[in-house]
């Protein structure tokens, strides 16, 4: 066996050379070079800038508050979807500033333009670029903030991370970044409506200490018209007036308040979401918590469920008149085991008070001196009313991505019709 090994070649030199008594320096061929020092490790490339969301339906937002404009690029949109600027403009108008006395007085038309990804009113399957110009910037309003950090704002942490920041309007930390999300969310909402008849609605359920009782809203029948009937976007007129009063009270005093947005999703296909790390409620929580000013997220019964026993909290099953498995209650919020069960998805997102306020606050300057700051600029006394379409958009982006995931993994082969719900286009027409 040893003699047979001597005939094999090793690194370009005869293996038999090792037994010839030659010096190590003469064992190698003239063409072979061994390194005399440790090689440098490869440079680690990290692609984690945090500006892209989604796996199959991918959205990248761009732009800053006081730059030339903002927008998004949508990659992975199915071809042949009827799409125009008007589909997005409806949602952008709901998000737009300057709508009422309880929002920022900044005047922007937020008119969007699709510059790629469509032809003859249909998507082509290639990336869709949507742009919205900024037209009402006032950079001088931020002169003091270039020197001193706004308490509870991203000013300081952006400096801590990058060592530089865009002062005017807060740059990427501004809520104007969400224009791209809302535009992309409009596309996602249209896909969901056309494909499965899925309807996403959000509304304001709390402003400061004004809390809308849950039993005053029937999530089965509440409509967009009811939500949009007042400037605070609360479907109950009585509580809407109370919420508007709470915002007006702090607005005239240069202060701000927070609140809660409730979001429901009707006609959700069963089977969306995957176990363990990519559970549907986990994806929804991440999406909603990525919005500016968010500080809390509840799903289904949420924290109130901790006061209940298992027998009180469990959603018991029954067979409905269409021979479908349903639940008598919906404390699970439409998701069990990280997977949608076909019931109404129900979640709540908490938003903190706007951090930029016209009241004197103690802070620290960039050169590390304690000082005081009274912030100028045009800011929402309460972000919650304008956050409603933002929450809807992020929920839509999650659900359309999960719809594509479900189709890719579980619908390639014939489904088990006794247990699974086949995914197929809905007969529902979009508005």
UniProtKB/Swiss-Prot annotation:
Assembly mode: Homotetramer.
GO molecular function, one term: FMN binding
GO cellular component: chloroplast; cytosol
Amino-acid biosynthesis recorded as keyword: yes
Name the record gives this protein: Chorismate synthase 2, chloroplastic
Organism: Solanum lycopersicum
SUPFAM superfamilies found in the cross-reference section: Chorismate synthase, AroC
Any GO BP: chorismate biosynthetic process
Source organism, top-level taxon: Eukaryota
